[in-house]
């Protein structure tokens, strides 16, 4: 029972990752290359004649050591004195945590490790981090072995970069105790989100919550002010449920339906739909996995009732969800995202660079949004290391990473404030249609590139989430 319950938790908890779009190994990300083909062939931009936007005479941005609008990311140099674990005169060891080897969900967050491998191959081709070869240590937590992987990393790694684990509070502070720094791809539990010695490139704070999607839909559907929330009562989803309810109430929504479904074997979907209809629900959010949302949508279709709009977290931007649930989907189903969908590669050079990076340096690897989020951590680490120069240290990495203003990973995602406490003010709207996931420019009302950046896109939360509030 513990294994089954935790397996379901692994599925649902991933909704907490800021822009996570995870899936098992046999699933494909929207906009990514189909199985057996290369991501770069599928979505290369039409820039300078070579599909990368760079001049043919000089090669792509990657050939020049750049990524998006970042230049000279990795390069040769004269390494300084090695004084910390994982740092030698010739190498720098970086650990990437995933749950890809879990028996319950094979391939979970595989894309993060695959991005790490691709980054290291490209970076080392250009001289490494200040002349040091990047060595990626594979820290596969397999859901239940996070504590063991942290113990290993404490003995071998200079930093954790670009990874994450579903049960990321299992080490009980061991990472911090050994002085190991972390630039994670994502953090899930409240304890992990506020942990010391950490800079999140795409922050998932506890006491700030991205409200852009609700704000946009509130403007588009002002009459839809009766919210229904359906969720599964497991550790991670229970936190995001509480955050959504607090945010919605602060925005003026009346939460008239707040129910839990069973993590395994739920059959009462029509009953939920009937109760939502009877309770007058006009706005709806479901917290969990796409498979359960498909079952609920089918029940809505059978009952002939849909809410005025449905808002979902970014983990629903999934090809399997579209394949199985597209025909029963409401016409007004939306989500917000800090990352553009893959079919915008022609408009977003850094997105094209990510696809090219994977095609060239890890062609068998998975391309997915969480892979991009992990890559943001590696790019932030490299930029910070460049600023540290010969005086490379863990303390310097944290200082320089946290000092980056408007971090976009070269344009890969919206502007972020690296750290643990500040949610992005910049998002875009995705409309889930029967034909796929589409950037909704009209709903987004972009004011900075393709994004809407507005202070009102974030709500400050005041309820107690069991961890200290950030210092003023």
What is each model feature region?
Residues 17-20:
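C-terminal motif of bacterial Sec signal peptides marking the signal peptidase cleavage site
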Residues 22-47:
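Short, low-complexity, disordered segments immediately C-terminal to signal peptides
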Residues 27, 107-114, 125-196, 261-267, ...:
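Beta-alpha junction/loop-to-helix N-cap segments that form part of ligand/metal-binding clefts
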Residues 45-81, 407-472:
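Solvent-exposed, acidic/polar segments of extracytosolic/periplasmic ligand-binding ectodomains
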Residues 77-90, 95-117, 141, 231-239, ...:
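Extracytoplasmic "Venus flytrap"
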Residues 157-259, 309-334:
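Extracytoplasmic ligand/sensor domains, especially the bilobed periplasmic-binding protein
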Residues 203-204, 300-375, 457, 464-470:
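Extracellular/periplasmic periplasmic-binding protein-like sensory domains
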Residues 233, 241, 245, 290-293, ...:
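Extracellular/periplasmic ligand-binding modules, especially the Venus flytrap/periplasmic-binding
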């Amino acid at each position: 029972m513990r294994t089954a319950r935790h397996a379901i938790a692994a599925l649902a908890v991933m909704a907490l990752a800021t822009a996570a779009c995870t899936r098992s190994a046999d699933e494909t990300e929207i906009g990514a290359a189909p199985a057996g083909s290369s991501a770069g062939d599928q979505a290369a931009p039409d820039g300078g004649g070579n599909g990368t936007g760079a001049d043919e005479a000089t090669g792509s941005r990657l050939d020049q050591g750049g990524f998006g609008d970042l230049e000279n990311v990795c390069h040769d140099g004269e390494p300084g004195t090695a004084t910390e674990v994982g740092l030698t005169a010739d190498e720098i060891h970086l650990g990437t945590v995933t749950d890809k080897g879990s028996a319950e969900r094979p391939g979970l967050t595989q894309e993060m490790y695959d991005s790490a491998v691709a980054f290291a191959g490209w970076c080392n081709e250009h001289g490494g981090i200040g002349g040091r070869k990047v060595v990626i240590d594979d820290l596969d937590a397999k859901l239940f072995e996070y504590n063991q992987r942290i113990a290993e990393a404490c003995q071998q790694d200079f930093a954790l970069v670009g990874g994450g684990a579903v049960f990321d509070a299992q080490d009980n502070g061991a990472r911090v105790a050994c002085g190991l720094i972390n630039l994670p791809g994502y953090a899930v539990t409240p304890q992990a989100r506020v942990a010391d010695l950490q800079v999140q490139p795409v922050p998932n704070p506890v006491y700030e919550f991205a409200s852009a999607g609700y704000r946009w839909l509130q403007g588009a559907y002002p009459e839809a002010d009766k919210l229904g929330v359906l969720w599964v009562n497991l550790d991670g989803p229970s936190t995001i449920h509480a955050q959504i309810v607090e945010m919605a109430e602060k925005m003026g929504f009346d939460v008239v339906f707040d129910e839990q479904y069973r993590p395994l074997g739920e059959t009462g979907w029509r009953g939920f739909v009937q109760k939502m209809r009877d309770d007058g629900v006009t706005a709806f959010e479901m917290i969990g996995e796409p498979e359960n949302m498909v079952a609920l949508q089918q029940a809505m279709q059978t009952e002939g009732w849909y809410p005025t709009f449905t808002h979902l977290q970014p983990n629903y931007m999934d090809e399997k969800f579209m394949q199985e649930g597209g025909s029963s989907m409401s016409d007004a189903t939306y989500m917000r995202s800090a990352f553009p969908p893959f079919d915008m590669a022609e408009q977003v050079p850094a997105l094209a660079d990510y696809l090219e990076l994977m095609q060239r340096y890890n062609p068998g690897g998975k391309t997915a949004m969480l892979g991009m989020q992990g890559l943001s951590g590696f790019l932030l680490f490299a930029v910070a290391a460049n600023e540290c120069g010969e005086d490379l240290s863990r303390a310097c990495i944290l200082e320089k990473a946290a000092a980056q203003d408007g971090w976009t990973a070269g344009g890969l995602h919206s502007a972020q404030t690296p750290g643990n406490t500040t949610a992005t003010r910049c998002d875009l709207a995705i409309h889930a249609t029967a034909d796929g996931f589409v950037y909704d420019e009209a709903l987004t009302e972009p004011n900075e590139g393709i994004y809407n950046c507005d202070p009102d896109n974030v709500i400050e939360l005041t309820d107690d989430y069991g961890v200290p509030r950030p210092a003023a």
